[in-house]
C-alpha cells in the first residue's frame, strides 16, 4: 500500500496536453522513483495513457494553469505521503533531462539542502533573465523560475500555505531564502524546446516586485 510507504523522494509533474513528451519522460525515469502527475484538463487522452501505465495521477476538470496545478499536486503529496523526505518538481515538456536526476539526488544526499534550485545554464527568455538577475542580486541564488527543484517536504509544508498562486515560484523561493534555510543551486543544461511558451515569468515587474 503506497499510502503506508515512506519515500525518500517523490517526483511531481504538471502536464497539459503533453502526452507524448510525458510518455518519453516516464519511460526514461527509473522505476525506483515514485511519480505523481497532475493532468491540467488535457484533451489529448493524457489521463487514459497514465491509467494504462498505472501511474498515480490526479486531474483537473478544467484547465487551472501551471502554478495552480503544481500547488494542488504538492498539497496532495503532502497530505497523502507526509513522511516523504524530498519532493521534486519536473516539467512535462521534455525540457529537463531525466539523466540529471541521479546526480541531483546524489548532491542532495551529500549537501542536505532545504531547497535545491536546478539553475539552467541556457536560459533564453529575456523575462526570466531579468527575474534571475534581481533574485541573484538579493539572495545570491540563481533561477527561481526553474521548473526543476528539490524541496525538503518539511520546509515545503511550512511555507506552501503562505504562497500567492500568481507568484508561486519566486514567492516560495524568496520565503525559504529569507528565513535562512539552506538553499543551493545545481547547474543543469536544458533541451531547447521550439515554440515553447513560458509557463511562468511572463510578468517581469510583478515577479521583481515581490523580491
Feature map (PLM): residue ranges:
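Short beta-strand-to-loop acidic/aromatic patch adjacent to the donor-nucleotide binding site
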Residues: 83-95
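Cell-envelope/extracellular polymer assembly enzymes that use nucleotide-activated donors
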Residues: 8-10, 171
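A conserved acidic beta->alpha catalytic loop
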Residues: 39-47, 94
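Short, well-formed alpha-helical segments that are part of the catalytic scaffolds
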Residues: 13, 17-31
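Short hydrophobic beta-strand elements that form part
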Residues: 10-14, 59
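Conserved catalytic loops of nucleotide-sugar-dependent glycosyltransferases that act on lipid-linked
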Residues: 70, 122-211
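Conserved donor-nucleotide/metal-binding helix-loop-beta segment in metal-dependent transferases, i.e.
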Residues: 100-117
